[in-house]
Amino acid sequence: MELPDVQSSLPEVRINLTRVGVKNVQKLVEVARPGKRPVIFISNFDVFVDLPGSLKGANLSRNFEVIDDVLQQAIDGDVNEIEELCSAVARKLLDRHEYAERTEVRMRSKFMVRRETPVSETSCHEVVNVHAKAIAQRNEGDPIIRKSIGAEVTGMTACPCAQNIMKDHALHVLENLGVAEDKIEAFFNEVPMATHNQRGRGFLCIEIDDDQHISLEKIIKILKDSMSARIYELLKRGDESYVVMEAHKNPRFVEDCVREMARKVIAQFHDLPGDSVVTIKQTNEESIHQHNAYAERKATIAELVSEMDKGTL
């Protein structure tokens, strides 16, 4: 006896659905690298297709089959980047869901990075939150695919405003103690003033066409270098002194971090097409306030270049 295909039957309410699929599909992703050890990601996938009003349901088992097929390609070395992996899944979903006009794949991963502390060169690890996305739109011939790659990194920021207040206070104290003006200036040049700090979380995502490539390592570096200082899981005394001094020599508002990321994106990825979309977010968890500070910018590469040329960034 042949079972009825319930998914292909007519629904009672015949409207199109924007997204139908599965969320939080957990997979271990192994991406091969030529001449190097493979990169391992602990990943969660969200996989969707659109559904016409003439169908009661989507065949969700096809989503799992496609993910497994593409993950095997990554192990075999046919897919070398996680955004390419999402793109490959989105493309295959269109093949397997012949009724779909649009497919979407999201991937959230934990990426373990080996680090060395700045002074003692002690080895430690850092977990970076990585995400990728691809959207495929059916078209005559090849589908139109847009993909994105991004990361979220934690760092340290030092408040410029409070630092100026403390510097002004120290100046009056030193003057009252009779310290010469040139000595005061020399002291300030060597020892940055105290200020309150924040743990900052920087987010950077770049959306590109399917034939473009973005280095995840470069995105992570931009994030780390756009705050006052990097932070580490393990610090010896010399390392701790270095990190604190580095942060206080480089005070930044939450707005400064976002603008610095934008500047570094343009410098690093200047060859990207102008319609590439950059999303930058920074959240600073305040130490002396009960609220957090936040700044954001979303723009195309062309828009950022135009503003920088005008001197607004």
Swiss-Prot record:
Chain positions of site May be catalytically important: C159
Superkingdom to which the source organism belongs: Archaea
Catalyzed reactions per annotation: GTP + H2O = 7,8-dihydroneopterin 2',3'-cyclic phosphate + formate + diphosphate + H(+)
Cofactor-binding details, from the entry: Binds 1 Fe(2+) ion per subunit.
Co-factor requirement: Fe(2+)
MF GO annotations: GTP cyclohydrolase I activity; GTP cyclohydrolase IV activity; iron ion binding
Protein keywords: Hydrolase, Iron, Metal-binding
Signal peptide range: none
UniProt xrefs under InterPro entries: GTP_cyclohydrolase_FolE2/MptA, GTP_cyclohydrolase_MptA
GO biological process: tetrahydromethanopterin biosynthetic process
Pathway(s) the chain acts in: Cofactor biosynthesis; 5,6,7,8-tetrahydromethanopterin biosynthesis
Keyword Iron recorded: yes
Keyword Lyase: no
Pfam families xrefs: GCHY-1
Enzyme Commission identifier(s): 3.5.4.39
Functional note: Converts GTP to 7,8-dihydro-D-neopterin 2',3'-cyclic phosphate, the first intermediate in the biosynthesis of coenzyme methanopterin.
Family (UniProt): Belongs to the GTP cyclohydrolase IV family.
Subunit structure as annotated in this protein's UniProt entry: Homodimer.
Protein name: GTP cyclohydrolase MptA
Native organism: Methanoculleus marisnigri (strain ATCC 35101 / DSM 1498 / JR1)
